[in-house]
Amino acid sequence: MWSFQDKIVVVTGGARGIGRCIAEQFSAAGATVCIIDCLENDYFVGDLADKSTLERFAERVIADYGRVDCLINNAAPKSCGITSGSYEDFEYAQRVGVTAPFYLAKLFAPYFGEGASIVNISSSRDRMSQPETESYTAAKGGISALTHALAVSLAGKARVNSISPGWIDTSYAVYEGADATQQPVGRVGNPLDIANAVLYLCSELAGFITGENLCIDGGMTRQMIYHGDYGWTLEQA
C-alpha cells in the first residue's frame, strides 16, 4: 500500500511494541530504518536520555546515509507518580520523552530530505489521566505541545505531527466482554493501528497536514461518562 523506497527512517524505541511495528512497516514499504533503543536491536543501542548518545547516534546515521526523510519519536518515558517518584525519575522521563525528540529534530534538521516528516508518539494521557502517572503524562503532554512548535519552526523543512494512542495491546491480544465493548469501535487497539497512521502522516497523501495531533483510541476519549449513565458505575475502593 505504501511506498517509502530508498527513504531513510529513524525510529526511537524501535526494538519492541509499537516502535517495532512502525519500523517493520517502514521496512516492508522499502525504507531503510535506523533504530535507537536501550534494548538490543540491529542498528544502535543507547540511552535516549543521554546527550552524547544522541549525538553519536545522529553522527552514525548521517555518516551511513547522509540524510533523514522521516523521524519517528516513539520511545516511551518511564512512568512514576507523585507519591513514589523521585526528582531523578521525573527528570529522566522528560529527557527521554521530550528532550530527546527535541534534540534529535535539531541534530537532523540540516540533513532532512525533501518532503521530510516528523511524527511524535504522544498518548491519550496528554489530555486525561489516572492516578500516579505524573512523569509519563507530563512527557506526553510535552511532546504534544512540542509538535506544533516544531511544525512552525521547521516550516519548509519538515512537516511535524503527533499521534496519541489510547489502549494499544502490543501482544495483539483479542479482548472480549467489557474491555472490548466499552470501546466505541468494539475492540482494543493493536500496534498496526498506530503504524498505519504513522506511515500515512509521512506519505505525500498527508502533504497538507502539519502541526496536528491525531488521537487513535477507538473513540474512548470522546465518551462522556457519569456514574449511573448507560450502565456505567463508579466503584470506590
What are these regions (language model features)?
Residues P77-E91, P110, E132-S135, Y172-V174, ...:
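Conserved mid-core segment of classical short-chain dehydrogenase/reductases
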Residues N74-S79, G219:
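Conserved NAD(P)H cofactor-binding loop of Rossmann-fold oxidoreductase domains
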Residues S162, G177-I209, L214-G218, A237:
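C-terminal helical subdomain
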Residues A105, A139, T147:
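Active-site helix of classical SDR
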Residues A76, S86-F102, V119, I143, ...:
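Catalytic Tyr-X3-Lys loop
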Residues W2-T32:
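Canonical Rossmann dinucleotide-binding motif of NAD(H)/NADP(H)-dependent dehydrogenases/reductases
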Residues R56-R60, G81, E88-V96:
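Active-site Tyr-X3-Lys motif and surrounding loop/helix of classical short-chain dehydrogenase/reductase
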Residues P110, V152-G156, G207:
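Alpha-helical segment proximal to the catalytic Tyr-Lys
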